[in-house]
């Protein structure tokens, strides 16, 4: 009898865990929170956003249905789907309930700057750190924080209200890798990877600096800052090989990301289906694309960089700009407002590395025969000019 009870308990635990297929550190979605969106979107608009932006290539078909007057999306296993009633047409749609406002001026615009990664003592763990010989280390987290502080000043001078998701290298999350070993084991098994001391350490660290940290920032953005726009600031990189002996590359490029392009595998997770619905229904996409297109144009002009081109199926080109792509990332998925996600400069490009060694400076210096601002001020100018072009048009 004891063995039977034990077997039944294990079976119940398996069924519970299986029914709640969630990505690492996610909580069960509150599907009822989407009820406020009933009647706020037409069938045509929902179909466009779902099938062309968020789940292209038929990725949506296993989990969503679209009928004449409603759509459904699968929730937890064994539970009824969430049903969304469509508006009769766009003209008769109810107002969209959301915290962000589609303002048309930089003055009064609420902007949250999200300097990617952490930097500081965490930079090596994040693998966003490299050093050539005795030169100054290149640390993305510290570099984008410097950009954010310069950018904050410039945007505030133009009347925007600006906040930062972090103002130091201190993590927003209270979790640390040693508290994430259980989730790390589950994550490794979900990926079909072996669990050993090295993989467990690496995955627990990844869940700390990427997953837990981004989720903590999203909680701050959505619950406290409630901006009209998030600017996610990053530098890009190509593989630099052996961390002990990194190599420089001749490649250098620019691209910007908006939320979209979920795969069928990603949509097998209940929380990702919920996140897609929340993002789609608050109508971030068109604003994200429009602002990203304007910023991409000014960044391309400021940086003189060609567009990066995705060759796989993890991203789709959108907005009529070769620089703007839709991709499903945790940050642009969880922030419940338009997000412009910037990826300029390849950090381990030789010229970029040399410019980082120069640090910040006023005026211009000769860089390969061209007078250039510091890489930080060039970044800031590209962003500011793009925002001015869009919001003050």
Name each model feature, range by range.
Residues 10-19:
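Hydrophobic h-region of N-terminal signal peptides that target proteins for export
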Residues 2-9:
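Sec-dependent signal peptide recognition
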Residues 6, 19-393:
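Catalytic-site microenvironment of enzymes
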